[in-house]
Amino acid sequence: MVTEGLKPHISIKKKKRKSGFLARMRTKSGRKIIARRRRKGRKRLAP
């Protein structure tokens, strides 16, 4: 029997460092992601 809904939790610090707003702004491709999310009208641009 397989249980579903349990996923590994990453620490908030690791999440922010990897995929936070400032991390996105550091790279060209990250800036493209932010621009794309702005165009789409996302309320949250980065987690």
UniProtKB/Swiss-Prot annotation:
GO terms for MF: structural constituent of ribosome
Region Disordered, annotated ranges: 1-47
Gene3D superfamilies: 1.10.287.3980
Keyword DNA damage: no
Leader sequence segment: none
Similarity annotation: Belongs to the bacterial ribosomal protein bL34 family.
NCBIfam families cross-referenced by the UniProt entry: rpmH_bact (TIGR01030)
Protein name: Large ribosomal subunit protein bL34
The organism of origin for this protein: Aquifex aeolicus (strain VF5)
Protein encoded by which gene: rpmH
